[in-house]
A protein has these predicted regions:
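A contiguous pocket-lining binding segment that forms or flanks enzyme active sites
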Residues: 159-169
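Active-site ligand-binding patch in enzyme domains
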Residues: 3-14, 19-159
Length: 169
């Protein structure tokens, strides 16, 4: 199977951390600027973030108690055609299905709107699948209890035509 080329684009402290107080010091400002400028250099169609990063500035927090669904959605990948047509994506690694969204895409200052694709495991509740469909958020199953990264990458390529993905942090 074909998979996208993965670019690992990280801004780290000297001790290898991708988060912390070092982001707030003036000496980091030039590095943050260069980090942002390099994002577009790579020409990636998608950026993959973990649950913590999504909660830190992309998702609308965690979903609360979801209403019981009358008809259980099938446990199959779901692709929103409108979102797919956007051609720019944010892939959210959310194995348990806990992230909340206000719609099918996320728009950050200085970046084009990106369709959200949730990477889930089979453990996710049927109510969450229904919620994602109502929000227009696509989702892919990539493992039973743990995320299978190879499977996820293959599906991103096959179902969304993603050839280059950025793992950012």
């Amino acid at each position: 199977m074909e998979r996208p080329f993965v670019v690992c684009h990280m801004l780290t402290s000297l001790d290898g951390k991708i988060d912390g107080t070092f982001f707030g010091v003036p000496e980091t400002v030039p590095a943050i600027k260069a980090y942002g400028e390099l994002r577009s250099f790579y020409g990636c169609q998608a950026t993959l973030y973990g649950t913590t990063t999504m909660l830190g500035g992309y998702a609308e927090g965690k979903v609360g108690q979801l209403p019981t669904v009358m008809s259980t959605p099938p446990r199959a990948d779901w692709v929103n055609p409108t979102g797919k047509a956007m051609g720019n994506f944010i892939v959210a690694v959310d194995p348990q299905g806990q992230l909340a969204y206000s719609g099918l895409s996320i728009e950050k200052k200085g970046r084009p709107a990106a369709h959200v694709i949730e990477a889930l495991t089979e453990q996710v509740a049927p109510e969450y699948l229904s919620y994602l469909q109502n929000q227009g958020v696509s989702y892919l199953f990539a493992g039973e209890k743990r995320l299978n990264c190879t499977l996820l990458l293959e599906k991103l390529h096959r179902l969304f035509g993603i050839n280059k993905l950025m793992l950012a942090g």
